[in-house]
Amino acid sequence: MRLNIVVVGVGGQGALTTSGIIARAAMRAGLNVVTAETHGMAQRGGSVEVHVRIGDVRAPLIPEGGADVMIALEPAEALRYAKFLNKNTLVILNTRKIIPPSVTAGTAKYPELDEIIGELRKVTPRVIPVNASEIAEKAGSVLATNVVVVGMLFGYYSMPFGIEHVEEAIRETMKSKIVDLNLKALKMGYNQAISGRPSAV
């Protein structure tokens, strides 16, 4: 068994937290996990790319075209890292944009959401656009957007470990005052996925 997940977003969205939760959950289930952050991160707003490889793997980097799943916390970042997609990749795409300074300054143009989705669907039909940030706000904080998307992953994809392992990972890694909020966000994301909306067409 081998599962390749690439998590992309911008600094401050919790891409590293997302990958860390998934990795810890997989390890709790007794699975081999290798992770790699392959793009400069530190500053808020910079592009972030994290690879999570689970199962029969040694090398930390997912090869181009080798992702089984892409979690895109920001729409344009999904396009930036589309080289990892193939015709079977599941893409969970948070639709809330974070406009980069270059666009604000007028030196670059941010693509329309429909354009982004259309380009991704040229590679894989399995693109699921969802405003995960809105769901997170309903759970209590937009900062839980990444956890909403993890919940959706378990609703849409047959994962090799249970969502209860994710709950354990959240309890272990997050500050006690935000655990309940994040568990709620996880459940809301999962329920959103299993309800069949939005469709994965």
From Swiss-Prot:
Pfam families: POR
Enzyme's top EC category: oxidoreductase
UniProt superkingdom: Archaea
Record bears the keyword Oxidoreductase: yes
Family annotation (PANTHER family): INDOLEPYRUVATE OXIDOREDUCTASE SUBUNIT IORB
Phylogenetic placement of the source organism: Archaea, Methanobacteriati, Methanobacteriota, Archaeoglobi, Archaeoglobales
Keywords assigned by UniProt, alphabetized: Oxidoreductase
Physiological role: Catalyzes the ferredoxin-dependent oxidative decarboxylation of arylpyruvates.
Catalysis performed (reactions): indole-3-pyruvate + 2 oxidized [2Fe-2S]-[ferredoxin] + CoA = (indol-3-yl)acetyl-CoA + 2 reduced [2Fe-2S]-[ferredoxin] + CO2 + H(+)
Oxidoreductase found in the keyword field: yes
Gene Ontology MF, one: indolepyruvate ferredoxin oxidoreductase activity
E.C. code: 1.2.7.8
Protein name: Indolepyruvate oxidoreductase subunit IorB
InterPro entries tied to this protein: Indolepyruvate_Fd_OxRdtase_bsu, IorB_Oxidoreductase, Pyrv/ketoisovalerate_OxRed_cat, Pyrv_flavodox_OxRed_cen
Record gene name: iorB
Quaternary structure, from the entry: Heterodimer of the IorA and IorB subunits.
